Amino acid sequence: MSSHLVEQPPPPHNNNNNCEEGEQSLPPPAGLNSSWVELPMNSSNGNDNGNGKNGGLEHVPSSSSIHNGDMEKILLDAQHESGQSSSRGSSHCDSPSPQEDGQIMFDVEMHTSKDHSSQSEEEVAEGEKEVDALKKSVDWVSDWSSRPENIPPKEFHFRHPKRSVSLSMRKSGAMKKGGIFSAEFLKVFIPSLFLSHVLALGLGIYIGKRLSTPSASTY
C-alpha cells in the first residue's frame, strides 16, 4: 500500500460584485484550507492474491480514508450549494425587489384608475350634453306648439276721421269746369237767355198791334 499526498483545493467563493446585498458564500470547513490529506493507494496487480501476498493481511480502510471520503462529499455539496446560491443571488439581483414590484403595480393601478376616471368624466360630460340637447328639443317643441300661428303683424296706420263737408255750389259737380253752372257756361247762357226774352217780348208786341188795327178799320 502506497500513500500519496494530495492538496485539497479550497472551496470556491462567490465573488458577485453586482449584488453587494446578496447572500454571502458559505465558510469553508475547518481544517481543509490548504491542508494535506494522506490517501492510501493500492498496488495495481490485477488480483486479490497479489494484494494478500504483498500485505499479508486483508486491507482495512483507515480512518483517514473514511474522513477523506466524507470531506469530498462535503466539498461537493458545498460547491453545489455555492453554485445554487450564486444563481439565486444573480436572479435576485436581476429580478426587481418586492418593493419595486409593489411600486410598479401601484403605478399601473394608478394609471388604470386615472384612465377609468378620465373615461368616466368623459362619459358623464357626454351624458350631460345629450340631456341638454333633449331638454332643448322638448322646449322647442313646447314653444312651437304653444305659440300662435306664424302670421306677420299688420302695419297699423293711424288715420284722422273725415270731416263733414258743408254744402256749397262751388264744390259741387255742376260748378266744376265743364259743368252746367260753370263760369264759362254761365257767361254764354245768361246773355243768350236775355236776348231770347227780348226777342219774344218784341214779337209779342208786334203781333198784338197787328191784330188790333183791322178791327178798328172795320168800324
UniProtKB/Swiss-Prot annotation:
Database matches in InterPro entries: BNIP3
GO molecular function, one term: identical protein binding
GO biological process terms, semicolon-separated: defense response to virus; mitochondrial outer membrane permeabilization; mitochondrial protein catabolic process; positive regulation of apoptotic process; regulation of programmed cell death
Domain of life: Eukaryota
Sites of Phosphoserine modification: S62, S117, S118, S120, S166
Subunit structure: Self-associates. Interacts with BNIP3 and STEAP3. Interacts (via BH3 domain) with SPATA18 (via coiled-coil domains). Interacts with PPTC7; this interaction promotes BNIP3L degradation.
Signal sequence range: none
Keywords in alphabetical order: Apoptosis, Endoplasmic reticulum, Membrane, Mitochondrion, Mitochondrion outer membrane, Nucleus, Phosphoprotein, Transmembrane, Transmembrane helix
Record organism: Bos taurus (Bovine)
Span of the annotated motif BH3: 126-148
Gene: BNIP3L
Biased composition regions of type Low complexity, renumbered to the chain: 42-51, 82-97
Gene3D superfamilies linked to this entry: 6.10.250.1020
Family that this chain belongs to: Belongs to the NIP3 family.
Lineage: Eukaryota, Metazoa, Chordata, Craniata, Vertebrata
Membrane disposition: Single-pass membrane protein
UniProt PTM: Undergoes progressive proteolysis to an 11 kDa C-terminal fragment, which is blocked by the proteasome inhibitor lactacystin.
PANTHER family, A to Z: BCL2_ADENOVIRUS E1B 19 KDA PROTEIN-INTERACTING PROTEIN 3-LIKE (PTHR15186:SF3), RE48077P (PTHR15186)
Function: Induces apoptosis. Interacts with viral and cellular anti-apoptosis proteins. Can overcome the suppressors BCL-2 and BCL-XL, although high levels of BCL-XL expression will inhibit apoptosis. Inhibits apoptosis induced by BNIP3. Involved in mitochondrial quality control via its interaction with SPATA18/MIEAP: in response to mitochondrial damage, participates in mitochondrial protein catabolic process (also named MALM) leading to the degradation of damaged proteins inside mitochondria.
An example Gene Ontology CC term for this record: mitochondrion
Major site of localization recorded for this protein: nucleus
Subcellular location: Nucleus envelope; Endoplasmic reticulum; Mitochondrion outer membrane; Membrane
Protein name: BCL2/adenovirus E1B 19 kDa protein-interacting protein 3-like
